[in-house]
């Protein structure tokens, strides 16, 4: 099953998570980051790593909003380097994109492999206020008599089962979804992704 089993490099589709972590670490969409050549030592007997932007151009100081909208590789690497690759790897693991990601700066450009299911599940957090919504394949299972023996619903409606309710408060629905980042970050990244379509690489 290519959606659940096939491993693929997400490439630039991973970048929103780099910028989400940046926003969680005191960056703002208007924070300036230098879009300029980066040369990194990979270790003994290995060539220097020189990531490049598409088109092999660079544009100087730019906002991280622009960095995401235009999918700038050099800016993304610099952001990941400033935040710390250990934090980025841990963040990606918490989002369940990767099980045990290597702490390499190249993962900021989506070099590590994952499945489409894991990636789309992580994307759901942007439109759900920073909560990770794990996909389900079975909604519920009932026996021959209509009794529910399995229900995937993770939300709980308080006081919904009461026969009569005379209080002033309306019943509240609480969920058990994992909070992976703030609602503010979710809102800002969603806005930045809209910019990808309006002004950036998705135009």
What annotation goes with each model-predicted range?
Residues 1-3, 14, 70, 115-203:
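A penicillin-recognizing enzyme superfamily signal
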Residues 1-8, 106-109:
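Short helix/strand-bridging catalytic loops that position acidic/His residues to coordinate divalent metals
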Residues 3, 7, 56-57, 81, ...:
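Alpha-helix initiation/capping motif
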Residues 5-61, 134-154:
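Short, glycine/proline-biased beta-turn/loop segments that scaffold the active-site neighborhood
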Residues 9, 18, 58, 108, ...:
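Short glycine/serine/threonine-biased micro-segments
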Residues 33-38, 42, 51-128, 136, ...:
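Active-site-adjacent helix/loop patches that line small-molecule binding or acyl-intermediate pockets
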């Amino acid at each position: 099953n290519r959606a659940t089993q096939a491993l693929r490099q997400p490439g630039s589709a991973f970048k929103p998570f780099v910028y989400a972590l940046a926003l969680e670490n005191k960056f703002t969409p208007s924070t300036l980051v230098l879009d300029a050549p980066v040369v990194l030592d990979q270790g003994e007997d290995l060539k220097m790593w020189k990531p490049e932007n598409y088109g092999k151009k660079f544009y100087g100081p730019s906002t991280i909003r622009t960095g995401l909208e235009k999918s700038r590789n050099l800016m993304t690497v610099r952001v990941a380097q400033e935040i710390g690759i250990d934090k980025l790897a841990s963040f990606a693991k918490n989002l369940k994109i990767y099980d045990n990601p290597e702490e390499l700066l190249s993962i900021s450009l989506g070099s590590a492999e994952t499945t489409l299911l894991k990636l789309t599940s992580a994307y759901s957090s942007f439109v759900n206020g920073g909560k990770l919504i794990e996909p389900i394949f079975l909604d519920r299972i009932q026996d021959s008599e209509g009794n529910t023996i399995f229900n995937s619903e993770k939300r709980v409606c308080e006081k919904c089962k009461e026969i009569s309710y005379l209080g002033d408060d309306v019943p509240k629905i609480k969920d058990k979804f994992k909070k992976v980042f703030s609602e503010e970050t979710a809102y800002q990244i969603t806005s930045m992704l809209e910019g990808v379509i309006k002004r950036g690489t998705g135009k």
